[in-house]
């Protein structure tokens, strides 16, 4: 298997340092690229993500019904959410794809990106243990868990924008951090959102990258409605 570049940078982005880097390499390898691909790791990661998020929601919402807990979990672990997480990690830059998938833009394909997130979760579990994996996932999901509430619509602006573009078979939005100001504990992020249908770029500014992306996505949705 050919080496994948910049894995140390990806580890920093993921906030996890692999002891066995081959596990990360395998997690990033699509079945079109090699016999030793990421599907088994994806199977494992899917189960781990489900139990960690289920446990977090159970304790966070002691009065929520089973139905509300199920709907919130579905929102947090569904493919659209995993695709957005993959985009936040810029996983498309690190995927190992076969020539056909590479040529057809597989590094942008939602299902491939979502599967890679689950595979990385499986790889982290094998490289460490369930508690380390749980702590990492809760860090990845901290803002989403803080924002989610039972009994209300669970779709945020980024998800709604993504679904809108998918409905018209358009490419996914591109989010880029164009400026970070302030000290480490008090930063302001400026994020640019670009989509194929708009010639102009849209800017979101907030105290975290994800919040800035949500603001930019909401503004794009408003422009698309006009």
Curated annotation (Swiss-Prot):
Residues 156-226 form the DRBM domain. Keywords: Cytoplasm, Endonuclease, Hydrolase, Magnesium, Metal-binding, mRNA processing, Nuclease, RNA-binding, rRNA processing, rRNA-binding, tRNA processing. Pfam families: dsrm, Ribonucleas_3_3. The active site is at residues 46, 118. HAMAP family: RNase_III. It is found in: Cytoplasm. It comes from Shewanella baltica (strain OS155 / ATCC BAA-1091). It catalyses: Endonucleolytic cleavage to 5'-phosphomonoester. Mg(2+) binds at residues 42, 115, 118. InterPro entries: dsRBD_dom, RNase_III, RNase_III_dom, RNase_III_sf. Homodimer. One of its GO terms (cellular component) is cytoplasm. Its cofactor is Mg(2+). Its EC number is 3.1.26.3. Its main location: cytoplasm. This is Ribonuclease 3. Digests double-stranded RNA. Involved in the processing of primary rRNA transcript to yield the immediate precursors to the large and small rRNAs (23S and 16S). Processes some mRNAs, and tRNAs when they are encoded in the rRNA operon. Processes pre-crRNA and tracrRNA of type II CRISPR loci if present in the organism. Residues 7-129 form the RNase III domain. GO terms for biological process: mRNA processing; regulation of gene expression; rRNA processing; tRNA processing. GO terms for molecular function: double-stranded RNA binding; metal ion binding; ribonuclease III activity; rRNA binding. Belongs to the ribonuclease III family.
